[in-house]
Structures are given as C-alpha cells and as structure tokens.
From Swiss-Prot:
Source taxonomy: Eukaryota, Viridiplantae, Streptophyta, Embryophyta, Tracheophyta
Family annotation (PANTHER family): MATURASE K
Role this protein plays: Usually encoded in the trnK tRNA gene intron. Probably assists in splicing its own and other chloroplast group II introns.
Record carries keyword Nucleus: no
GO cellular component: chloroplast
Full protein name: Maturase K
Highest taxon of source: Eukaryota
Length: 506
C-alpha cells in the first residue's frame, strides 16, 4: 500500500500536478480492480490479473479517439466487443481507474498541511450523519419554518465536468473524460432521481459519484458563504432584504421610517440565522424568523441553481411550511413539532388564575407505508403488509435463515430507535417474524401451525422482540429509574454511519 502512494506522489511531482499521465500507469488499474468499496483506496491486489491489463486499457483509449468509433448505437452498447473483450467490463475498469486518479491526488493535496488537515477533520465531523440527530433534538423545537428542497440534478454531463474543471487544470484529462462519458454511458438513465442511485450501484462507476459530489460541494460552498455573510449583517443593513430597491439612495430614509413606524415588524429580523441540513440529495432549510426571510432564501437558491449551474428548478418544488402544520421527510423519518397545551393553576391570596402554557415536542415517526413498500419489494410481504415466505432462502440451513432475518430486524430496530412512537416499528418486526416462520415452514414442507406445534413453542423466535430490550436493560440495570425510562424512549445510536438500504425507498 505504501509503495503505491510513493509512486503516485512521484508521478504527480514529475508531471507538476497534471493527472492525464496517471491514466497510463499500470498500478492505477491494479488499484481499481482490487479496490474494496467499503475499505481503503489502497488495498491489496488479490484478484489482479490480465483483466486489468494496461495494454488493453491503452487500446480502448486509442479506439475512443478514432473518429469512426465515437458513435455507438444503443443496440450495440451492451454487447459490443473490443478484440474479443467485453466493453462493459473495461469501461468499468477505465472509470474506476479515472476515479482513483482524481480522488487520490485530491486527498494528498488537501492533507498537505496540518492546518488544512484540521479543517478537513472538522468538516468531516460536521458533515456526518451524527450531526443531524442532535440537530433534531436540540434545534427543531425552537424553529418555526422549514423549507423542504431536493438539490436538482444536472441536465447535462458537461455541467459536472465544468464544475470539476474549476479545481484541476489538465485539458487532456477533461477531453478524455468527455469522450469516455459520452461514448460508454447512457446519461438518460442517470438524470432521473429515482433511478440514479440504483444505476450507480449496478454499474459501480465511482467517477459519477465523484463528479456529482463535486457539484454538490461547489453549490454548498457558495450557499454557506452567502449564509455566513448574511448572518453577520447589522440590523440596519439587513433591513434592505424587504426590498432591494431601497439598498442605494433610499436606505437612510427606509431605516428611519421602519424604526419609527414598524419597529415591531423589524424585530423579527434581529436573528437572521438559517439552519441548513443535507443528507445525499435532500436538504432542509429551517429558521425561527418569519416566512418572508424563508421566501428570500428560496429565491436565492433558485437563482443560484439557474444562473451559476444552469440547472432549472421550479419554485413550487421548494415548499415553506410551519413545523406545527406539516411534517417533513429526512433520513427515513417523518418529523414534525407538536404543540401541547397545558393549563397551570396559580393562586395568589384569594385569587386563582389559570395559565395556559404551550410546550413544543419533537415527534419522529417511522414511515410505515414506505417501509412496507420496501419490504414488499424485497419479497418479505405483499403490498398490503401480509407476511410471505422467502423462497430463495429456503435452501439455507435453519440457523442461516433465522440469522438473516434477525440481522435485518436488528438493523431496522437499531436505526429506528430514535422514533418517538414505536408502534410502527413493532409492526415491521412482526412482519419479519412471520416471514421467517413461513420460510422455515416452507423449507420443512409443512404448514406454519404444524411447524410451530412441532417446535412446542414460539420461544425460538422471541429474539425478534426481546434481544435489544435485554441488552439495554443490562446497560441500565444499576442506573436510576430516570435513566431506565430514558432508554425506553428515543435513542440515537452513534454507530450509525449511513442510512439503511431498506430506508432508501424514494
């Protein structure tokens, strides 16, 4: 692993940070072929063989530059052969090699100094899934308005390439990238949000994820710059957000009039702070201030996408709602803020008063309908939520079948333990439990009732409901009654690093 990194640093220093020559290095494709997506980039090349030969890669790139091979019909795109080689296989090798070429130098450049390394470490902590759960608990109950928006996808690959071009300065690399993208990839399947992630997972083309993440990073850097600047403006300066026409000649008169006649209205803008949360392509803007400020930021985002990134976004796709009126969907939860009215009796001498207090409570609800739809797609139940057997697992041993179902149930229960209402989660566990029983009965060629009767009891499958509760009771067995009540409520687990596969139902 260290040898690859040394070679790469030497190549970059010799070429003065030009990336195109790295495409023709043999070890790059060794890294790409032996790369484990869940592990480090520098992995051992256990499976490295002639399938990732540099000679074949050079031949493919040469054929790409030939004019008569720039246009390939859709019918031949999956079965076309290059001198006896499968084109899809080697297009994936080139793509993986290109992704490593652009990812590793970027990481080396960003970690070149200790100060930059600390900045990167700081932002990595902020941009993890762990920072979103405390935001739910600590901030949402004090905010009034939320804007639910999805970052629009680029309508053309050239937009992604141009955004990446701001960082690198290698013209041959971009020329090769354009040829590769247009000849080997069908972008029409990628611009649809519902097909984007599934297409990426099937093709395993990391270069697309890299370019898209670069696009999102560029957008967020501009947005956060504007947000930080606006939050540091003084009260008199920020008042111009009511109407831009007062910014120049009429600013003094404007401030004087508002300070005299509309001081109560102006006080809403004393804290022009916007909370921004994003996970994957879904973003949330939340604010404590009036809806006028949220509408301003909505227009800023639309104009930023249209004029800077050439991405069209309909204004109606960004909706602004009050927390108490409508919930929003993020990270597999439906979240809203419920208002609880309580009356407190206060007595002073002979007079008694009833004081109404409004308490805000955050509710995170498990979306049962999308989850049942995901379970039905995975063949654990039908579309109505009735459990069915899993025939493809019937050939496994009883232990493997139970272990697979328990693993899925444990993951869902682990992730959704942050919900304020567990009833929907118990229903999902019930579906998985009966599906497991029906799968075991199908394997033993018996009915469910006969299978359970032969076992004598249902204790074999009680782990679906008792395992997690038993673990938590052991953790808090010596704690006070207050702590024992806490673990029965909402818990955000800190070992969650990504959203569960079954939760990606959109």
């Amino acid at each position: 692993m260290e040898e690859y990194q040394v070679y790469l640093e030497l190549d970059i220093s010799r070429q003065q940070h030009f990336l195109y020559p790295l495409i023709f290095r043999e070890y790059i494709y060794g890294l790409a072929y032996g790369h484990d997506f869940n592990g480090s980039i520098f992995s051992e090349n256990v499976d490295y063989d002639n399938k990732s030969s540099l000679l074949i890669v050079k031949r493919l790139i040469t054929r790409m530059y030939q004019q008569n091979h720039l246009i390939i019909s859709a019918n031949d795109s999956k079965k076309n052969q290059f001198w006896g080689y499968n084109k899809n296989l080697y297009s994936q090798i080139i793509s993986e090699g290109f992704a490593i070429v652009v990812e590793i130098p970027l990481s080396l450049q960003l970690n070149s100094s200790s100060e930059e390394a600390e900045i990167i470490k700081y932002y990595k902590n902020l941009r993890s899934i762990h920072s979103i759960f405390p935001f739910f608990e600590d901030k949402l109950t004090y905010l009034n308005y939320v804007s639910d928006a999805r970052i629009p996808y680029p309508i053309h690959l050239e937009i992604l390439v141009q955004v990446f071009r701001y960082w690198a300065k290698d013209a041959p690399l971009f020329h090769l990238l354009r040829l590769f993208l247009y000849e080997y990839c069908n972008w029409n399947n990628l611009i649809t949000p519902k097909k984007l992630i599934s297409t990426f997972s099937k093709s395993n083309l990391r270069v697309f994820l890299f370019l898209y993440n670069f696009y999102v990073c560029e957008y967020e850097s501009i947005f956060l710059f504007l947000r930080n600047k606006s939050s540091h403006l003084q009260l008199t300066s920020f008042s111009v957000l009511f109407e831009r026409i007062y910014f120049y000649g009429k600013i003094e008169h404007f401030v004087e009039v508002f300070a005299k006649d509309f001081s109560s209205t102006l006080s809403f803008f004393k804290e022009p702070f916007i909370h921004y949360v994003r996970y994957q392509g879904k973003s949330i803007l939340a604010s404590k201030n009036a809806s006028l400020l949220m509408n301003k930021w909505k227009n800023y985002l639309i104009h930023l996408w249209q004029y800077h990134f050439d991405v069209w976004s309909q204004p109606r796709t960004i909706q602004i709602n009050q927390f108490s009126e409508r919930s929003f969907h993020l990270l597999g939860y439906f979240s809203n803020v419920r208002l609880n009215l309580s009356a407190v009796r206060s007595q002073m001498l002979e007079n008694a008063f009833l004081i109404e207090i409004v308490m805000k409570k955050l509710e995170t609800i498990v979306p049962i309908i999308p989850l049942i739809r995901s379970l039905a797609k995975a063949k654990f139940c039908n579309v109505l939520g009735h459990p069915i057997s899993k025939p493809v697992w019937a050939d496994s041993s009883d232990f493997d079948i139970i272990d697979r179902f328990l693993r899925i149930c444990r993951n869902l229960s682990h992730y959704y333990n942050g919900s304020s209402k567990k009833k929907s989660l118990y229903r999902v566990k019930y579906i998985l439990r009966l599906s497991c029983i029906k799968t075991l009965a199908r394997k033993h060629k018996s009915t469910v009732r006969a299978f359970l009767k032969r076992l004598g009891s249902e204790k074999l499958l009680e782990e679906f409901f008792t395992e997690e509760e038993e673990i938590l009771s052991l953790v808090f067995q010596r704690a006070s009654s207050t702590l024992q009540g806490l673990y029965r409520g909402r818990i955000w687990y800190l070992d969650i690093i990504f959203i569960n596969d079954l939760i990606n139902h959109e």
